[in-house]
Amino acid sequence: MKKLVVAVFALGLLTACSSEPSKPAPVEKPKPPEPITARNAFQKCYIAARNWARDAQPYRIESILTDDSKGREGKSRAWRVGFASPTQQHSSRPYTWEDGEVSFGVEDSYSPSNTSTTVFDQAFLKVDSNQALDTAQKHGGDKLLEKAPDTPILYIVDWNRQTNELTWHVIYGTDPVSAKLRVAVNASTGDFLRVEK
């Protein structure tokens, strides 16, 4: 009996001393969502905006540069869409799609007479950001990217009151002011409009 107790005690000591703490199984990080085009991001933000105001209308769609998304192929990992509501006491609210999630920003005042917040009917947005890029590439973008392949590309779509049309601004650079090239493309037809810089 003593031998059995000693054997069990020795076995217990060996097990306690020699066993390593169990390591947790390596957890794979979920792969971030792929970059998407402006119209895909717009649709996701539009649903959220309609929950805020049933009459929400877009006035601007723009891509946001991130470390791992430089606007290639007309896609981005982050898009911001500005919506305005005439019935919500003339207010506006930005919505952002980033890595698969939609969030909203701070509500702000909205004036229909302000040219930078002129709302547009989404039916005019027939040309997506990747198609706008194709047009811009044919008008100087391809040559610029050959010389400077790391140049980021931004996309902005808004209503142009002077020409009364929805316009894509394909911007080769980190912002519109310091851009190396800006190309305007009709967002309804995909036609080249002009080189803005």
Where on the chain are the PLM-derived regions?
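Long, terminal "pre-/pro-" and other extracytoplasmic accessory regions
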Residues: 17-197
